[in-house]
């Protein structure tokens, strides 16, 4: 969803558990 995980995903993946890539940032559900 909307909350930002404090991580970007220019590489296409997120390392933070429970976060997914919503280019170019990672979001938590």
UniProtKB/Swiss-Prot annotation:
Disulfide bonds join 5-19, 9-21, 14-26. Transmembrane segments: none annotated. PROSITE patterns: CYCLOTIDE, CYCLOTIDE_MOEBIUS. This is a cyclic peptide. SUPFAM superfamilies: Cyclotides. Keywords: Disulfide bond, Knottin, Plant defense. There is a cross-link at residues 1-29 (Cyclopeptide (Gly-Asn)). Coiled coil: none annotated. One of its GO terms (biological process) is defense response. Belongs to the cyclotide family. Moebius subfamily. Probably participates in a plant defense mechanism. The presence of a 'disulfide through disulfide knot' structurally defines this protein as a knottin. This is Cyclotide vibi-A.
């Amino acid at each position: 969803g909307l909350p930002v995980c404090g991580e970007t995903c220019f590489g296409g993946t997120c390392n933070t558990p429970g976060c997914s890539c919503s280019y170019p940032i990672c979001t938590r559900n």
